[in-house]
Amino acid sequence: MSKQLIYSGKAKDIYTTEDENLIISTYKDQATAFNGVKKEQIAGKGVLNNQISSFIFEKLNAAGVATHFVEKLSDTEQLNKKVKIIPLEVVLRNYTAGSFSKRFGVDEGIALETPIVEFYYKNDDLDDPFINDEHVKFLQIAGDQQIAYLKEETRRINELLKVWFAEIGLKLIDFKLEFGFDKDGKIILADEFSPDNCRLWDADGNHMDKDVFRRGLGELTDVYEIVWEKLQGLK
């Protein structure tokens, strides 16, 4: 399958395929935090992220969620549907943590009575600012119906993920999703789902996600390996 690099990101490289509607996503060993300010090469990270994300996307597909995932090609590669990415990071919070706690001056780990969905404008130059629905419309990123769909679909995905992670003894604190338009103009889930873009805490409150790297709490791959081993228990 011939391929040409079309995009190089912080965590993945994207390649063309012989089918104009398909791409190959190659997961890197690079770990970044604080919008790329903190950066490090960590051997084995790409393999673990690809394994975890492929597994989660397969389960989401089986549950009826429309995603870009087609199949896992190798340890670090997966085949995806080509999408036009919507320049929004859609964040859902089940508990207070991270920037939410800092922004509102509250402790981490407080359960939210109703999960909160937030939008962040995907723009590295602006440091991905927190925006609301009206900003999304002003920037002509999405209209009312599309905004409602993004929120509804994110909440539906959350209900699935919460159950799966609870089954393996992990609490889903929050996560970030990205969506895109497929060749037919339908909004589908894209990007990845791994400990890179979610927060997971075990029963003792230990971080099982990229906060280990952000906050210097231990070895990233050790934690990701534990998450991957636990997930395989869902099969």
UniProtKB/Swiss-Prot annotation:
Catalytic reactions of this protein: 5-amino-1-(5-phospho-D-ribosyl)imidazole-4-carboxylate + L-aspartate + ATP = (2S)-2-[5-amino-1-(5-phospho-beta-D-ribosyl)imidazole-4-carboxamido]succinate + ADP + phosphate + 2 H(+)
Domain of life: Bacteria
Pathway info: Purine metabolism; IMP biosynthesis via de novo pathway; 5-amino-1-(5-phospho-D-ribosyl)imidazole-4-carboxamide from 5-amino-1-(5-phospho-D-ribosyl)imidazole-4-carboxylate: step 1/2
UniProt-listed Enzyme Commission number(s): 6.3.2.6
Source organism of the structure: Streptococcus pneumoniae serotype 19F (strain G54)
GO biological process: 'de novo' IMP biosynthetic process; cobalamin biosynthetic process
HAMAP family documented for this protein: SAICAR_synth
This protein's name: Phosphoribosylaminoimidazole-succinocarboxamide synthase
CDD domains recorded: SAICAR_synt_PurC
Higher taxonomy: Bacteria, Bacillati, Bacillota, Bacilli, Lactobacillales
UniProt similarity note: Belongs to the SAICAR synthetase family.
Keywords of this entry: ATP-binding, Ligase, Nucleotide-binding, Purine biosynthesis
Gene: purC
GO molecular function: ATP binding; phosphoribosylaminoimidazolesuccinocarboxamide synthase activity
